[in-house]
Amino acid sequence: KDQQLENQQLAQKVGIAVGALLLLSLALIAVTLWRMRRAQARLTANQSLLRAQSERDPLTDLSNRRHFLAVMDQRAKDIDRRADDDGFHGALMMIDIDHFKNVNDWHGHAAGDAVIVEVARRIRAAVRDTDLVVRWGGEEFLVFSPELPGADLALMADRILRSIGGTPVETPEGPLRVTASIGFASFPLGGSGGAALRLHWEQAVNWADMVLYKAKAEGRNRGVGISAVDAPDADTLAAILQDFDAACLNSQVRLKLLLGPA
């Protein structure tokens, strides 16, 4: 009997020890899983932060050119998968701060940064929530507006001109008058006979940049947009870009002019 009792007690002790070991093992596994999940969450958060930082301009917190290129590449892939592929759709606006080099040279880089930040804020406030505002580089910005008709695009460009140039920008060196030049176009461009002319998004950016150059060449503090293009095909469009001024003079390209605040 004594031996049997001892065996039972020993079995109980072994059972308790095994149970304790199992509980300890489960606790260790739970802690390990929790730590792994926390590490994975930190890794995911860090990756998201790095991705966001790589796609944002640190000064203005706008999208940067890299983000815009990624968005356009994805849209191009989506278009290529569709049967009704007729190229880039949407409106583009290129915005350049007038005489920005003078701001840096005469008032310093702190004033220049203040101007960049405030102009970015005014652009963002003047567009729709669905529009993508990009710091394109230096003092230049790009706005991509999906599904925006040409008439509404002109209204938006006028709103941005007046927002930027309407009131001085406060800087560490005091208030500065700032104006901008804008080039804008809605795509696809209408060809002769009403047919839509297919363009890749990079070509669309070139057209917006071309009318921005026109706005700057004609005096700045203004917007120039494309109202109509007389071109039967893509080859004619390419030829127009080679001599844009001549195409405007002979009315192959008809422009819309917006004047900024006096």
Task: Annotate the PLM regions.
Residues 71-107, 123, 134, 258:
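Active-site-proximal structural segments of metal-dependent nucleotidyl cyclase/transferase enzymes
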Residues 49-53, 65-88, 120-128, 146:
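Short regulatory alpha-helical coupling segments
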Residues 96, 100, 119, 133-136, ...:
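Hydrophobic framework residues that shape the active-site pocket
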Residues 50-70, 95-109, 117:
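Conserved nucleotide-binding and Mg2+-coordinating catalytic segments in signaling enzymes
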Residues 120-124, 152-170, 205-209:
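Alpha-helical scaffold within the catalytic cores of cyclic-nucleotide enzymes
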Residues 133, 181-218, 224-250:
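Cyclic nucleotide signaling catalytic output domains
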Residues 125, 132-135, 176:
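A short pre-motif secondary-structure segment
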Residues 1, 9-58, 66-78:
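Signal-transducing coiled-coil linker helices
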